[in-house]
Amino acid sequence: AVVCHLERYTPNGILLRKVDKTYLLGFIDYLKKTKQEHCKKEKTLHVNTQFYYLKTLRYCLNRAVSEDYITVNPMNKIKNEDKPKRNRTERDYLTIKELTRLVHTPFYNILLRKAFLFSCFCGLRHCDIIALRWEDIRYDENGNALLSIIQKKTKEAISLPLCSEAIKHLPDRGNAPETEKVFAGLVSLGRSNVILHKWVEQAGISKHVTFHTARHTHATMMLTL
């Protein structure tokens, strides 16, 4: 998503060594004014999305410094007051309508798509989904699924029933042994969040969505049942 906006900001491209303070200030101004794609109503980018895009660009420039493509990160010359401010008061979650829109929006990263939707319907953290193995999911004589794990973050053991919607978004097991990870190959949390933005934009959702949004979504759905 960041690359798409950089291409729209400078259609003819720019050499890495020519990315300076002026270029970055112009990009910040572009982010403030540009309209969301795939959205019926004309809306500018959410301030949290602007913040995230700039953070991603900073990371890329830091990598360029570490790889000796450039000597300094020009982002360090930008004053904090000139950067988009993250709105920390909001705890975004997906409404049922938005979640349904995501469910019906195809995406090239099928594994991440399944993992995110699975989290929406069961509430597991990204770190627990990455560690999840087929042996952690058991079925009783009635076909009801129960997930039992020790949470990575809290070290607490939990057991929770899996609804049919959660089970629907599990990958196809095939002949995988019980010890194999359910979501084998799922990328890191940071990378997952970068990729999620593309899917959310395709679905026409304007909220700042990260993998953790799935937990908020699940918690909100539980409160409304």
Model-based region annotation:
Residues 66, 117, 121, 127-128, ...:
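C-terminal catalytic core of tyrosine-transesterase DNA break-rejoin enzymes
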Residues 19, 51-52, 186-190, 206-225:
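Short basic/aromatic active-site micro-motif
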Residues 88, 151-171, 177-198, 210:
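C-terminal catalytic core of Y-nucleophile DNA break-rejoin enzymes
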Residues 1-8, 25-32, 58, 79, ...:
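Amphipathic, well-packed alpha-helical segments that form the structural scaffold of globular domains
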Residues 77-82, 122, 131-172:
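Conserved tyrosine-mediated DNA breakage-rejoining catalytic core shared by Y-recombinases
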